[in-house]
Curated annotation (Swiss-Prot):
InterPro entries: TMEM52
Membrane topology reported for the UniProt record: Single-pass type I membrane protein
GO cellular component, one term: membrane
Pfam family, one: TMEM52
Compartments (UniProt record): Membrane
Signal peptide (UniProt feature, chain positions): 1-24
Region (Disordered): 158-183
Keyword terms of this UniProt record: Membrane, Signal, Transmembrane, Transmembrane helix
Basic and acidic residues bias: start-end ranges: 163-177
PANTHER family membership: TRANSMEMBRANE PROTEIN 52, TRANSMEMBRANE PROTEIN 52B
Name assigned to this protein: Transmembrane protein 52B
TM ranges: 40-60
Length: 183
């Protein structure tokens, strides 16, 4: 198919070149059969021809580039970057988390205190053994659990509410009063 496209493009280019060289004679016998267009002065036609030729050239260049790259990859010459290594660091305590949340309390308000309460509750449930001298390996770190998850059927422990979040639910009389006011 690529050869067919090249032949068609070359024949069209040759046709325009030959057509531009022909001029109509002034003493034409039948004006209907006479070519009166001066192709040399029609710059927009030549612009389209040049753009088409440039697109064809870019297509050929990209095709050659792809063929070269694919042949290199099949031959095994492509020495890509080595795979990434992941380092997992385990902390014995959440002091970094606590200091971060404490410093951001002014920005986040009660939400930061709630996160801090969750961090405290989880850090007291499962600490890493302090006898570890070195950091665990990657496989060991994958199997470690940082947070305790409640088993199916168990209820997660309730955290005490933050003072800003304490709001008394409306009593039954107040809720009926609110419903009546809507009606």
């Amino acid at each position: 198919m690529g050869v067919r496209v090249h032949v068609v493009a070359a024949s069209a280019l040759l046709y325009f070149i030959l057509l531009s060289g022909t001029r109509c004679e002034e003493n034409c016998g039948n004006p209907e059969h006479c070519l009166t267009t001066d192709w040399v002065h029609l710059w927009y036609i030549w612009l389209l021809v040049v753009i088409g030729a440039l697109l064809l050239l870019c297509g050929l260049t990209s095709l050659c580039f792809r063929c070269c790259c694919l042949s290199r990859q099949q031959n095994g010459e492509d020495g890509g970057p080595p795979p990434c290594e992941v380092t997992v660091i385990a902390f014995d305590h959440d002091s970094t988390l606590q200091s971060t949340i404490t410093s951001l309390q002014s920005v986040f308000g009660p939400a930061a205190r709630r996160i801090l309460a969750v961090a405290h509750s989880h850090s007291s449930l499962g600490q890493l053994p302090s006898s570890l001298d070195t950091l665990p390996g990657y496989e060991e770190a994958l199997h470690m659990s940082r947070f305790t998850v409640a088993m199916c059927g168990q209820k997660a422990p309730d955290l005490p509410p933050v003072p800003e979040e304490k709001q008394l639910p409306p009593t039954e009389k107040e809720s009926t009063r609110i419903v009546d006011s809507w009606n």
